[in-house]
Amino acid sequence: MQQITLSKPVSCYGIGVHSGKRTQLTIEPAKENTGIIFIRTDISSENNYIEAKYFNVSDTLLSTTISNSNKIQVSTIEHIMAALWGCGIDNAVIKIDGPEVPIMDGSSKPFVFMIECAGKKLQNAPKKYLKILKEVTATHKDCELTCTPSDHMKIDLTIDFNSKAIGRQNLVFSKQESFNNNIADARTFGFTKDGDYLQSKGLALGVSFENTIAIDDQDKVLNPDGLRYQDEFVRHKLLDLFGDLYTSGNNIVSSINGYKTSHALNNELLQRIFSDNTSHKFVTASEI
């Protein structure tokens, strides 16, 4: 199994769901072993690039933000990271002229479409996998995320909200190739009761029915077109998990169980994995 990049650059425009700012984003091909790198083209500093790695995650409030040593940052990276993972892209440079990845329709599907339009290119280096060797767990209150050794990827995710519109939902997923058709178009969601508070804090300034599932005080979905799936909420949480875990830099080979996960918990699991050298190793496909 070889590493993969894009065949050519591909671009989009959109607004940030939290900043409300309009940005242009371009995904470009990158050399073998580059990984995923973001470059802030609106900043002239030589240090305007940020590796999309777990150790660069600087904020996990409502989304995942990465920063470099100059405190230059890019926020809400999880949806495009999930798309890159789902499409099997190992190496890419993402150029963006603002602080936040466009929210598009609130899912990963537009980014998947962009990558499919650009095409994929096989590279002359083997794809590397992160194989888990022993159980690692991250917890916060009643929330938990655990990875255990396995010869293939399998995720069992449960969410539980005190909302009749969502409630308790469970999803088991094990085929990366089915991500684009079954998970990628699941949208982000939020509660109208939180809107004023979030906007007073400079968040959710770009929210609309076009990019967010809105749930009102009566636990009703307000979007005119309703849901794309009955369990769209857990599908989106799984999407977020894939995007966050891809900041490991590799596909993870493990059985993963999650309960009420969050961006913070997803990153904490990676921090725990990489803080223990005996918990993992990097392998090629033939070594899995």
UniProtKB/Swiss-Prot annotation:
GO function terms (MF aspect): metal ion binding; UDP-3-O-acyl-N-acetylglucosamine deacetylase activity
Active site location: H263
Catalytic reaction equation(s): a UDP-3-O-[(3R)-3-hydroxyacyl]-N-acetyl-alpha-D-glucosamine + H2O = a UDP-3-O-[(3R)-3-hydroxyacyl]-alpha-D-glucosamine + acetate
Record's GO cellular component terms: membrane
Cofactors demanded by this protein: Zn(2+)
Binding site residues for Zn(2+): H79, H236, D240
Protein name in UniProt: UDP-3-O-acyl-N-acetylglucosamine deacetylase
Organism: Rickettsia bellii (strain OSU 85-389)
Lineage: Bacteria, Pseudomonadati, Pseudomonadota, Alphaproteobacteria, Rickettsiales
